[in-house]
Regions:
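Short, contiguous, pocket-lining structural segments
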Residues: 88-93, 111, 130-134, 138, ...
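A conserved active-site cap/scaffold subdomain adjacent to cofactor or substrate pockets
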Residues: 144-163
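Hydrophobic alpha-helical transmembrane segments of multi-pass inner membrane proteins, especially
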Residues: 122-126
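Glycine-rich, mobile lid/loop segments that gate access to catalytic sites or pores
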Residues: 4-121
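Conserved small/polar residues in nucleotide/adenosyl-binding loops
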Residues: 167-171
């Protein structure tokens, strides 16, 4: 699945990741997934279709969970977007929640991982919806550095972490 998406998008190997939730042990219908990828990439994939992506990942969710922010850091402004799925089996530690955060900030991957882990511990990992747990959860923070604005100071890191908390309360 990843290789087909990478090929259609013109990306290199290991630049696409696949996530899923569902019945544990039940295999995904790979042929249907591949058919969907082949249909959606040329027809709908565009910067303007973020809301459609947030809608597409919904399963039992009743509303789209998405947000976009501009955040002032010590050296400039960055954009941050997020979308998530998950409405049940969220207790504790995210459970079946899948979260995707993107930013145009520039940062060292190790620093981003530390910042994200600390932020998740104080936000997403404290969510409880129904008391049910699951084995499927993920949060991804993708930073392309396009703004050239670097996450440098402790205040910058705190501001980024605070957004995770804000998103958790909004979602």
């Amino acid at each position: 699945v990843e290789r087909e998406a990478e090929k259609l998008l013109g990306l290199g190997e290991d630049e696409v990741f696949v996530c899923s939730t569902g019945v544990i042990g039940q295999r995904l219908p790979v042929d249907k997934v591949l058919q969907g990828i082949r249909e959606i990439i040329p027809a709908k994939l565009a910067k303007e279709n973020g809301s459609e992506a947030a809608y597409a990942i919904m399963t039992t969710d009743t509303v789209r969970k998405e947000c976009a922010y501009e955040l002032q850091l010590s050296t400039g402004t960055v954009k941050i977007g997020a979308m998530a799925k998950g409405s049940g089996m969220i207790h504790p530690n995210m459970a079946t929640m899948l979260v995707y955060v993107t930013t145009d900030a520039k940062a060292d991957p190790a620093d981003l991982q530390k910042m994200l882990s600390a932020a998740v511990d104080k936000s997403f990992n404290m969510c409880t919806v129904d008391g049910d747990t699951s084995t499927n959860d993920s949060i991804f923070l993708l930073a392309n550095g396009a703004s050239g604005v670097e996450i440098k100071t402790e205040e910058d890191k705190k501001a980024m972490a605070d957004l995770c908390l804000l998103y958790t309360s909004d979602a």
